[in-house]
Amino acid sequence: GYGSINSLSQVLLKMTLPGVPDFYQGCELWDFSLVDPDNRRPVDFDSRRSILRHMKKEEGQRGHRESLWRERKKGWIKLYLIWKTLEIRRKFKCVFDEGEYLPLRVAGRQKNSIIAFMRKYDSCWIMAAVPRLLTGFMHEGLAPAQAEWGDTFILLASAALPSSPNAIAIGTHSFP
C-alpha cells in the first residue's frame, strides 16, 4: 500500500538525487527491525543473490513487474528497483558523478503529489519522478499509475531538453 510506495519513492530519490546513495547491508528488501541492536543481525546474502538471479531470469517476461507489485509484501520489488537503478547509474555514470540537478515543475490537480527532476551531463539526460501524498486521491493497494492523476503533468522546459535530434528515450521503469 502507501508504505510500500513511500519506501520505493525514497529508494529512487536516494539513488538519483545528487550525492552518493547509502544502503545498510540487508536493507535491499523490506526491513521491519528497529534500531540497534536489531539492525546488527547477520544478513542472508545467499537469499538476496537467489532472489536477484530469479528476477534476472524473469526480466522481460510478460507480467513480471506486475507480479512484483502484486506480491510487494515479499520485498522483491525494492530489490528490483535498486538493481534496475544501479544499472542506470552504471550506464550513465557521468550523469550521476558530474551532472547537473534540474528540478522540474508539476502542474495540474495533483501537482503536489509528484517530485520530479532531471540530471544532465553534456548530452546525456536522466529524468526521475516519484509519487507522494497519495492518500487523498488514491485507494489503498493500487499502484500509483492507477491513481486518478487527472490533468497532472510534468513541465519540461525547452531549456531542459536535449537539443540533439538523436535523443531518444532509453526506456521507462514504472509499475502498473
Describe these PLM feature segments.
Residues G1-P176:
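Carbohydrate-interacting/catalytic domains
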